[in-house]
Amino acid sequence: MNKILLKTTIIFTALFSLNVVASPLDWQKVKRPIPSEDGKASPIGSYTNGCIIGAQALPPKGEGYQVIRMNRNRYYGHPNMIQYLERLGQRAKAAGLPTMLVGDIAMPGGGRFLTGHASHQMGLDADIWLRMGEMSDADALNSDGKGLLVVDRKAQRVDERVWNSNHATLIKLAAQDPNVTRIFVNPAIKVKLCQTAGNDRGWLHKIRPWHGHNSHFHVRLTCPADASYCENQAPVPAGDGCGDELYSWFEPPKPGTSVSKPKVTPPEPFLCQQILNSPNRREWLE
């Protein structure tokens, strides 16, 4: 593949091509990482509205981890994420944990999904399953229906029949990395972690309750220091997050507050739109 002069491409496209807003289907067609001018990866936009230039693929297997759902082609990320997952796999193995199963990271160029995710668009998000232990190659290729549900949805608490200390240890190891800004889990999992963390609670503030997330947890890394076009989230609130905010997730909705407003999809970052309109796009499209 010839070296692509990204800046020249973007300027040319901005001046001479139609400014067509990309659809999720457009990003689905990106089958290879989009190369950068200088070889450095660039996350563009935000976690829920962006793309990535120079993504890398996480190898299917490494020390302490295995990539699953490979048929979806969502195992690409920023180099920081790839290195983070490799480090976490090594730490998990050193702690005596079963093989860590890595789910979706991002598509080769990032961008919006047709199904499954609102975020995971810049290669700085990754799902790690709560099922642990190596899968066969066939199951790793297509892992649908093979997850482990650790939350009793009716009781809104962790299912003690399947939850064990390995889950808590892996989440704690995942949160202790300084590049991690948030880890999303089901509110019931956060409650369990708050109850069992003991005196070492310095990592709990990163564990954020969110809808779903009852068979996996979702790691989010901070924007790299040199990423000029990457937008960080606001910092998490102070404290361990084990107080009223957490337990508010279990309260019934107040009358008159359940009316949902229609969601307005914002336009994608200009650079992401122009990448898909690039004269060189055949090099990374199917």
UniProtKB/Swiss-Prot annotation:
Domain of life: Bacteria
One GO cellular component term: outer membrane-bounded periplasmic space
TM annotation in the entry: none
Residues that hold Zn(2+) 1 according to the record: 117, 120, 127, 218
Ligand binding (Zn(2+) 2): 152
GO molecular function: metal ion binding; metallopeptidase activity; serine-type endopeptidase activity
BP term (GO), one: proteolysis
Keyword Iron: no
Keyword Transport: no
Alphabetized SUPFAM superfamilies for the sequence: Hedgehog/DD-peptidase (SSF55166)
Subcellular localization(s) per the UniProt record: Periplasm
UniProtKB keywords: Hydrolase, Metal-binding, Metalloprotease, Periplasm, Protease, Signal, Zinc
Family that this chain belongs to: Belongs to the peptidase M74 family.
Protein name, UniProt field: Penicillin-insensitive murein endopeptidase
